[in-house]
């Protein structure tokens, strides 16, 4: 998975992409979970989730271009790769492993490993943090890609101003709503355990 992730990023030919990959490695991105208890809550889950978002976004792009061929340049494969693969970089170095008591299937408490969130190191919003970390790595990134990373969570739990900004970002480029939809599809459908379907 790590190799495929890095190969896709490098295929964009972006200046400083190797610095981004170095920073991801240093922050533990490739070993990190995607969430504390939900989708991808295991080592490497974040890499798997990011690739699922990329695959979902590329599939949606293909379907959208059949309906709207004029969107081809606005939904370039390189922009989708950058936004989809880097939308959750803020989750690297965000979770720590802890031991908790939890009831098993027969009601007996046992020690289990769980992830806990530790965001006190850089407490800033989820989408904003990912966008800042990508910029901090020196990546040559477009405004549309930044908007897609910033708004990948969609219009949930936003202030009135933030709802307005989300709508504005969606009018500027189709990339933010595409990445939001792909992220939702990956976490809520593709990564759902088969037993829960």
Each predicted region: which residue ranges?
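Non-catalytic interface/linker regions that flank or bridge core catalytic/transmembrane domains
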Residues: 1-32
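Inter-helical turn/loop segments and adjacent helix faces that build the functional surface
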Residues: 63-71
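Amphipathic, well-packed alpha-helical segments that form the structural scaffold of globular domains
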Residues: 25, 51-58, 62
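Divalent metal-dependent catalytic cores for phosphoryl transfer on phosphate-bearing substrates
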Residues: 42, 48, 60, 72-195
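Generic alpha-helical structural signal
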Residues: 3, 18, 51-55, 128
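Active-site flanking loop/helix segments enriched in acidic
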Residues: 25-49, 114-116
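A general structural signal marking secondary-structure boundaries and capping sites
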Residues: 12, 61-64
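Short coil/turn segments at secondary-structure boundaries
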Residues: 17-24, 32-36, 96-98, 161-163
């Amino acid at each position: 998975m790590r190799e495929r992730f890095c190969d896709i990023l490098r295929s964009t030919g972006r200046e400083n992409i190797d610095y981004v990959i170095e920073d991801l490695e240093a922050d533990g991105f490739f070993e990190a979970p995607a969430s504390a208890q939900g989708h991808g809550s295991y080592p490497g889950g974040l890499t798997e989730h990011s690739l699922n978002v990329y695959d979902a976004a590329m599939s949606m792009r293909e379907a959208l271009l059949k309906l709207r061929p004029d969107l081809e340049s606005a939904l370039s494969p390189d922009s989708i790769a950058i936004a989809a693969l880097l939308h959750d970089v803020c989750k690297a170095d965000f979770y720590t492993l802890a031991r908790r008591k939890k009831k098993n299937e027969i009601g007996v408490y046992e020690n289990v490993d769980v992830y806990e969130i530790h965001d006190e190191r850089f407490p800033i919003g989820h989408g904003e943090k990912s966008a800042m970390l990508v910029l901090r790595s020196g990546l040559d990134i477009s405004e549309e890609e930044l908007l897609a990373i910033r708004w990948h969570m969609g219009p949930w739990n936003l202030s009135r101003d933030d709802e307005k900004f989300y709508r504005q970002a969606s009018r500027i480029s189709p990339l933010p709503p595409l990445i939001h939809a792909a992220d939702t599809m990956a976490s809520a459908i593709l990564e759902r355990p088969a037993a829960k379907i």
